[in-house]
């Protein structure tokens, strides 16, 4: 990604308004997730663990983030689309929205107006309130697509960005057929809530706590427990220093599960042009 996204930065706008439909949507999912213990089964718990990894590590971390947002490696188009579909099923937004917002975050990290989830506005803002008080320039398609023109010109990504929410319906029906209500509650509601917070911790906790290996221009930090629940994304100081690298864990103790999957794809000949080291002479990204 070499485009100068700062040149199309959104204007510093007015105070955002609370969007109740977002509050109700996330509130209902959290309430239903709390009912999960009444539908417990060991198979449902196993499904939860598997889907948290599949949608979190493969769909979001590997797909939406390292592949689509930063282009740190390449895969065949059919595989790219399949991984993006898995990312859409994570219910964290369509690919154009997610990638566009993340690129805005990197272009204007911690700017209180231009970073969609600036940590300078506090833990809860960067964690979830940025969704409850949405700024049009971050949630309007015609605006955020400017940050992801490579995706916006592809019909598949436009379709996925529009209909990602509806994909949960056939997915939930499939889970019901396979395992009844326990699979629905653990595979949809509880899985969504846990994965949402796992991802949000990268925006909030990893900009507040942890250690800094590199003297980057922002407050991103390396936080071990966030890396556990996000499969390697918690090594955030490393990532903000070298955002186009396919791996975030740079030392042996910085476990990066998503990087293992990329290495497997590379071994199978499916991942090409993998960026596994900083650009020569680079100090930060």
Swiss-Prot record:
Annotated transmembrane regions: 20-40, 44-64, 81-101, 169-189
Reaction catalysed by this enzyme: a 1-acyl-2-hexadecanoyl-glycerolipid + 2 reduced [2Fe-2S]-[ferredoxin] + O2 + 2 H(+) = a 1-acyl-2-[(9Z)-hexadecenoyl]-glycerolipid + 2 oxidized [2Fe-2S]-[ferredoxin] + 2 H2O
Swiss-Prot/TrEMBL keywords: Fatty acid biosynthesis, Fatty acid metabolism, Iron, Lipid biosynthesis, Lipid metabolism, Membrane, Oxidoreductase, Transmembrane, Transmembrane helix
GO molecular function annotation: oxidoreductase activity, acting on paired donors, with oxidation of a pair of donors resulting in the reduction of molecular oxygen to two molecules of water
Alphabetical list of InterPro entries matching this protein: Acyl-CoA_DS, FA_desaturase_dom
Pathway: Lipid metabolism; fatty acid biosynthesis
Predominant location category: membrane
Induction: Constitutively expressed at low temperature.
Cystine residue pairs: none
Membrane topology: Multi-pass membrane protein
Cofactor(s) the protein requires to work: Fe(2+)
EC id: 1.14.19.27
Record text about domains: The histidine box domains are involved in binding the catalytic metal ions.
Protein name stated in the entry: sn-2 palmitoyl-lipid 9-desaturase
The organism of origin for this protein: Nostoc sp. (strain 36)
């Amino acid at each position: 990604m070499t485009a100068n996204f700062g040149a199309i930065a959104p204007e510093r706008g007015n105070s955002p308004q609370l969007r109740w439909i977002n509050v109700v949507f996330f509130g209902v999912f959290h309430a239903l997730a709390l009912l999960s213990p009444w539908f417990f089964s060991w198979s449902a718990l196993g499904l939860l663990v598997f889907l948290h990894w599949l949608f979190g590590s493969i769909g979001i971390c590997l797909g939406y983030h390292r592949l689509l947002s930063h282009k740190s490696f390449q895969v065949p188009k059919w595989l790219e689309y399949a991984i993006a579909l898995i990312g859409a099923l994570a219910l964290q937004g369509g690919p154009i929205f997610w990638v566009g917002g993340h690129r805005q975050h990197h272009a204007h990290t911690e700017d209180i107006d231009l970073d969609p989830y600036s940590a300078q506005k506090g833990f809860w803002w960067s964690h979830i309130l940025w969704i409850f008080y949405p700024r049009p320039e971050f949630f309007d398609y015609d605006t955020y697509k400017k940050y992801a023109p490579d995706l916006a010109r592809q019909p598949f990504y436009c379709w996925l960005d529009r209909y990602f929410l509806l994909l949960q319906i056939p997915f939930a029906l499939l889970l019901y057929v396979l395992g009844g209500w326990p699979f629905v509650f653990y595979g949809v509601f509880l899985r969504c809530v846990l994965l949402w917070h796992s991802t949000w911790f990268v925006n909030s906790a990893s900009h507040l706590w942890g250690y800094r290996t590199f003297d980057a221009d922002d407050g991103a930090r390396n936080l071990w427990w966030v890396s556990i629940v996000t499969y390697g994304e918690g090594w955030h100081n490393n990532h903000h220093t070298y955002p186009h690298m396919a791996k975030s864990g740079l030392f042996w103790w910085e476990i990066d599960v998503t990087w293992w999957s990329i290495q497997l794809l590379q071994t199978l000949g499916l991942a090409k042009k993998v960026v596994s080291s900083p650009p020569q002479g680079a100090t930060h990204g």
